[in-house]
């Protein structure tokens, strides 16, 4: 936030919209929402742009409205509103990316890992459609009330989808903001909720403070403000509203938006009187960046009596709002985000929110300016200046010398002399056990780490809700987590194989890392099967979602749902598979639902079921024309009809089917055969992704070999197709290919192709 936030000077700041009839204030807008999926309400009500200079879609940009049918995205309603705003020169807000209410109906039927994939896909499609956005309600209504009940019944499911509470209790929200910032770094990212000004004030403040303190890229807090005046619940007083606004701002020190203001009062005089109390207090607050009213047409709002126009005629409250917006107080009120633009992105990222007394805590100030240049950043702990930083990445260390809560403050000074501030907090615990690797030895990856060898330190710093002493005899608990300091020897793709045991289904875990610039999920959320007993361990393969960089990392093993046991984690480097060549089926880089089991003298994909899939990073070293490639799949099955589909995904996203492999009944899952076949698809050279989708389950897959012929030596046109035939180099007919050089003759689309094949 700019230090000179409350100054009245705004040289060069343009009015948001030349067409705005109510607000001419350059620091903040007075906006509204769509009416029954339309922008202009009709019915004698003035056109939208003649009243308001900001628009929010009431429903049109919510996930359920856009992707009601999975994979089909309907942006028509949102486009209509946003394009209207652009035509008339005012701003708009995307509402909302994450909400535990209006999500697609199909989402809840998916397992957690697939739900996260679906949510990531939702973010990606929103980014692809809207390259830039001025403002986003990233998360809507995630607070729990004073009774502990979530504001929306879908919140527990959404929380699980985004990785659970984790180290902070709000990691799922941090993850949502990181995902939004990754895609729209210049947007103003907002947390939005109701009852934040009356009944759930403290829980709301705690949530927003935690996001801010953890370094999440949250830029503002949004008060919906439905709780300020209602025939059902009464009216807030002027004194109470003043008090709670001050309480919020003192605690948060961030810009505030009033996001969904309405006064649901049937009596005209009482509605007007309540607007006269609340609107000036909200609008004139120097930390208020804008006010959005939640509907204005009687009969077309979510509650009965909040409309400001009834039968096309202004209610007295609307007449007063128009008069108030022309006063000097309304016109000259200052705000934190001139022109509704984010100049400074400043987030303080401590390595942890808790630290032992006497220990050293690394801290990064994530700082980026939109149009200005950073000269220096000063970081304070309380009133003590601990660092002045002039070059990115703006990382320093703090040695915790006394216990208690500490306030961090970053002051960013730009080359034009402007200053911007951001706060955070850390807790210094009274314990003096410093955080360090288990047995003071940092394991090098690739290697195996026993699950009980998590870092030494205090509870809440290096682990939570687990006991090293009872680790092998006590099932892991919901919300537990353990951190492991490791040293990755080389950049590259890795996988994690986890030995688990469980007497029930439903356990879940994932591996994450609290980096300075992101909360990274290194694995997808993995479900733990019922292995039969607490001592019967099964290996689960968890591909790492992104390549690891060489150097020191701190991995966090998050127990999303407990009730199971973990013995060890084995980290393996995955070599990039060169094709032609052999691909070991267990060496996948991504996948969903598959199991790795022992088989055929090693590891295999086992007990496959329909819908499972795996992907492999491959490098095609030899391009192939139509029919040049063939495959050999080492497989087993005890049933008829098992099959899997092979697809090659090129670097530009183009998908090419390589065909479907029908797995024969080999008599037993322990009896493996080699299934051969032709690939009638041209294959390009270069790095690509090979995907295997299980069409009909019941098979095991050990390996897949792709073979490219060394060259086509003759071709002649034929009128009828024949089966592939094998010949020796001297022309002798063979019943099957032999070791060494073979000639293969195959009729493809009426053309006989003879190829050299080396076995």
Predicted regions and their residues:
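C-terminal outer-membrane/trafficking sorting elements
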Residues: 373-385, 409, 709-759
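Acidic-and-aromatic substrate-binding clefts and catalytic sites of carbohydrate-active enzymes
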Residues: 32-45, 63-76, 103, 143-146, ...
